[in-house]
Amino acid sequence: MARYLGPKCKLSRREGCDLLLKSGVRDHKSKCKSEKLPGQHGDKKPRLNSYGIQLREKQKIRRLYGILEKQFRNYYKKAARQKGSTGENLMALLERRLDNVVYRMGFASTRAEARQLVAHKAILVNDKVVNVPSFLVNPGDTISVRQKAKNQGRIQAALALSEQRAPCDWITVDTGSFKGTFSTAPTLMDLSSDYNVNLVVELYSK
């Protein structure tokens, strides 16, 4: 299961925004103090051409969801084959990933932690164990925490932290029973305005 293991603050600094790669126990600015780009010449921000802007936007979204390049490109190809807007299809696929849904429901403080919970068989989909983080959840699917994992301190802490985040309209969660339902795939209007997925479509369609 390939994944990035380097410093997380470095990625957020490179993209110039909080990629939510670390838990919300401390404020992002106190964890990633430097506003400069990483590296020896980080205080010199380069001028980006159109390709550079598209590339940075792709890297931002890819890193936000914790996906490596090959898998991200495969998601784009799948989205392009589907009917409708390629950008909207791409974001819907990313949001349907099981590790992302577990994070959105508040059972993990980061997507990386959610990926670990899934891989360690702590998560059920429709009452069946699924240990594949990239598993695509369908509308109406029920996601829950296994009984023996409910007392894990990190899950309890994540649920407390999730109360600070804005609720997702496409997900319903019963924190008391450690269970939630994925109602529908979100639209671009539902998601953050901090990124522009259309730039990714322009980049890959060249």
UniProtKB/Swiss-Prot annotation:
UniProt KW RNA-binding keyword = yes
Q: Which Gene3D superfamilies match?
A: Ribosomal Protein S4 Delta 41, Chain A, domain 1, RNA-binding S4 domain
Please give the InterPro entries that the UniProt record associates with this protein.
Ribosomal_uS4, Ribosomal_uS4_bac-type, Ribosomal_uS4_CS, Ribosomal_uS4_N, S4_RNA-bd, S4_RNA-bd_sf
- Pfam hit, one: Ribosomal_S4
What GO CC annotations are associated with the protein? small ribosomal subunit
Q: Which PANTHER family match?
A: 30S 40S RIBOSOMAL PROTEIN (PTHR11831), SMALL RIBOSOMAL SUBUNIT PROTEIN US4M (PTHR11831:SF4)
Functional note:
One of the primary rRNA binding proteins, it binds directly to 16S rRNA where it nucleates assembly of the body of the 30S subunit. With S5 and S12 plays an important role in translational accuracy.
Question: What family classification does the UniProt entry report for this protein?
Answer: Belongs to the universal ribosomal protein uS4 family.
Instruction: State what protein this is by name.
Output: Small ribosomal subunit protein uS4
